[in-house]
Amino acid sequence: MKTLNELTLLDKFLFDEVMDIPEAHEAALRIILGDENLRLLTPSQTEKELRTAPWLRSIRLDVYSMDENLRIYNTEAQKTRKPDLPRRSRFYQSFMDSSLLKSGDESFNLLNDTFNIIITPFDLFGEGRYCYTFHARCDENPSLVLEDGATRIFLNTRGTNRNEISEELIQFLEYMEQSTLDVDI
């Protein structure tokens, strides 16, 4: 077991503790999304559990929040390489969506826009990117976007495409992995 001094922000305990501070989670989201105007409306909730029925699998979101534009964020740190992360993000997306509409809501346009963000110290897709952003697109016409309001972002702290993303995001991702007490800020 690691000591507290050996933990980085990719370790669940420290990630949850830091992101439980609304200003820290807001700052992280601003950097990740490149949106300086992003303001959280609700305090961040760590370890938010969503359940539907006792016999079905529930989920526990690392850090859940909503901004003043009513966009929903789930931010996860995933230190262990698991090949099912894309399907896990789909499962989390469906759970988040199922809790957003009330009985009797007639329009699915009432669904909030959602962002599932997973930060990893490995390249899940093997292309050397720091950031992989996914939206639903038409296979026959990739320029046709479904516009369903769902965004999934996979961040890799060990990317190599430095010229394609902001220096601030690169520094943030490097800090996520190297953030022990021995590292100067």
Language model segments and positions:
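Elongated, amphipathic alpha-helical interaction scaffolds
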Residues: 1-185
